[in-house]
Amino acid sequence: MAEFLLEIFSEEIPARMQARAADDLRGMVSDGLAKNGITFDAARSYVTPRRLVLVIEGLPLAGPDVSEEKRGPRVSSPAQAMEGFLKSTGMTVEQLEQRDTGKGVFYFAVINRKGRPTAEVLREVTEGAMATFPWPKSQRWGANSIRWVRPIQSILALFDGSIVPVAFGPATAGDMTAGHRFLAPEPFRVKDFADYLSKLRHAKVMLDPVERRHAILAGAEGLAAAEGLQLKADDGLLAEVTGLVEWPVPLVGSIDDKFMDVPAEVLITSMRAHQKYFSLLKADGSLAPRFIVISNMETDDGGKAVVAGNQRVLRARLSDAKFFWDTDRKQRLEARLPKLAERTFYASLGTVADKVDRISALAGNIAGMIGADRAVAERAARLAKADLSTELVGEFPELQGLMGRYYALNDGETPEVADAIAAHYSPQGPGDSCPTAPVSVAVALADKIDSLVGFFAINEKPTGSKDPFALRRAALGIIRLVLENGLRLPLSQVIFLASGHYKANLVNSPGEVANDLLNFFADRLAVALKEKGVRHDLITAIFSLGGEDDLVRLLKRVEALGAFLDSDDGANLLIAYRRAANIVRIEEKKDGTIFSGYADIQLLRQDEEKALEHALSDVGQAVSNALVTEDFAAAMAALARLRRPVDAFFDKVTVNADEAPLRVNRLKLLAMIGSAMGRLADFSKVEG
């Protein structure tokens, strides 16, 4: 069995594209081999900033022999038909077989093909993969018509120790490559993957991104510990830097003290966004005046010149940040509000100033429902977007809200207002903390609900995988705010209030928006609770009742329904419900009528139907009492008492009695089972 080694050596591949590219290369070549019937033991791909590598082990020297049969014309067919068949198969009449198929005697061609050499297939598949490679962005270079993410320098392609002459544009594969751009740029020849890996290491290249990541993290943590500090965790930055270096060398640098009065978030964001530096923290969690840079160089002076150069660049960056910070604080947030009228929120939904007016009013509405101070909530919402016109947020949009908090405190606003400004975008994802302070919750809800109502009202709803306005995230944020804070919030009422704050002519009515949004929340709630093992069909079964817009109450009902269905009584009653519903549906269709209302007690002949009617009456009262107190577990327990009388009814009573009045009465009794159970959930939506 043989090995295939492929290296595509180019200018620097953007870090964000590397992992996907390695997966795509492995997948495309593997699929191409499979289509040609060539199997192998393992395929692994690697990527560095300058090289995309694939190694496939356990390959045969040739593909399998193939035997193919083609049926031709009848033996009695004219010569013209025979000529076409012979031409398509490349055979003579003497080489054909004659077979009686039962429908006549036909010619058959049995074509035996030797398996193609694997090297030939590898060349074809590799060139095809490169020609159709799905880079998010690619370019042409020189006089070439081909495209690649960055100009290709060389291609290395070896199969069983021999060169596979892969050609792509001006590059034709050989057995040569080069090491680190600065530390070992000389070309060298390789024999196989083991030789390649060893020589790359000697040439200052760590091929495996997992190894580079580990080296960066371990080195950075070691330097931090030596300073008595901790490395600020940042998986995104770690992944990006891993894709920027082939030979990582962590170094520690210093931040000038004059910058340390700038908010830590600004310093961290500036270092991360512009310089790809890791921040270091003191034992109390505050930012230390140190940073870690990952160099791609080993130097004779131990990195002193590299550190000095990076500190010089950082001073310029942080000088800009400090200037923005000082400049922004000279103008109060409230004075910035008129500028929001110059910013469009969305063409059909007005300006950011319009949105601020709406969320301020809505935050006041919500505050009264959740026990927050209405005036404080309205004030916080009024200032929540003001930092969008500041210099720092213009430079670092990810700091919006957070900088508003700093500026609000600088202006003398209360901590409650400042905290609500900072938190009003939260939670932005499953890893983001959820606001708990009542005012912060009111403003965060108002901001998200306003967006959902507006976009749904103009039919800009998420479709499939497309969600350009992050409305799914907004809905999940609302769900978390409500559930994690235990808010008894009537969402329908809030949606109608939000619709009323829009001055624009919206396409859909408030009622349509409320209905669409409640269904949207049901779908998002199912997604949010899936990780907790809550079945989506149970959520649908409760929502389908209609009128349930209290998410806390809905969750209690779902939990009670789940526990009920997990019980023996619940599982068996569900079977009986389906049986009853099926019978009623069939008979209603047959009679062209609806069996509703109460069964006539005077027409109950058998003990089992009398017992069922009595049980339905008792259970109905018990369910009513439980629903008043929202004791849904008790309501389900009451429902469970129907199991035995329902089972006895089906065992002993003939529903389709010969006497028409008895038949109708018994069908009404079955319909009453559905009605009784339907007060707690739409059991027709329950799966399984």
UniProtKB/Swiss-Prot annotation:
Q: Which residues form a coiled coil?
A: none
Q: What is its EC number?
A: 6.1.1.14
Q: Name one GO molecular function term.
A: glycine-tRNA ligase activity
Give the UniProt record's GO annotations in the biological process aspect: arginyl-tRNA aminoacylation; glycyl-tRNA aminoacylation
Q: Name one GO cellular component term.
A: cytosol
Q: Kind of enzyme, top EC level?
A: ligase
The reaction(s) catalysed by this protein are: tRNA(Gly) + glycine + ATP = glycyl-tRNA(Gly) + AMP + diphosphate
The UniProt similarity line reads: Belongs to the class-II aminoacyl-tRNA synthetase family.
HAMAP family with a match to the protein in the record: Gly_tRNA_synth_beta (MF_00255)
Full protein name = Glycine--tRNA ligase beta subunit
Species of origin reads Paramagnetospirillum magneticum (strain ATCC 700264 / AMB-1) (Magnetospirillum magneticum)
Task: Report which gene this protein is encoded by.
Answer: glyS
